[in-house]
Amino acid sequence: DEGACCVTQRALIGRILEHTMSQMRLNPLNGRWVTIVAERAQRPNDFAPRDSSVEDPSRPCPFCPGHEENTPPALETVEKDGTWSMRVIPNRYPAFDGEEAFAVHNLGPVFVMAEASGIHEVFVYTPDHHSGLHLLDDDHAGQLMRMLRDRFAEHAATPQVRYTQAIVNHGREAGASVAHPHGQILGLPFVPGEILDEE
């Protein structure tokens, strides 16, 4: 009966969404996966209102030395001269999280979704709040590449991760919510269509 089918489908959707902080939906127009994470809209923002380019001075930077208690415990730390020079921490507002296997749910003609399981980490690649990737010396840049290599190897050993990507988004225009120089490492449960197109 069609009514019972709709009730069952709504119950399935409810169960999936109830346990999923983030989800992926298949764009029916281009066949590419899109990640939807409502919680990321609630991230604190270091920047003043959109019409200003200055930082909000009332909020201490969680990525600066001495504020480590404002972030989750480090997954990896590179030390230099008795203090850290780089840290990798879990993203407090992950787009990808969880150990579920990639499973597609066809919930309607244009509603195809999957849990956004995977790994989402932040790498703070300098303790200097006013530095940037382009200002790292050769030794520091080499350490950063080795640290990223190690994180990629760990992701590759994780069953639900099929593709890992590192990104650096510096400044509000690039989508960063914290002004301190940092990047993100995303362990995805699928290989993005753009990558498959290049093969």
Describe the residue ranges of each PLM region.
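Cysteine-centered motifs
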Residues: C5-C6
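HIT superfamily nucleotide-processing domains
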Residues: I16-E199
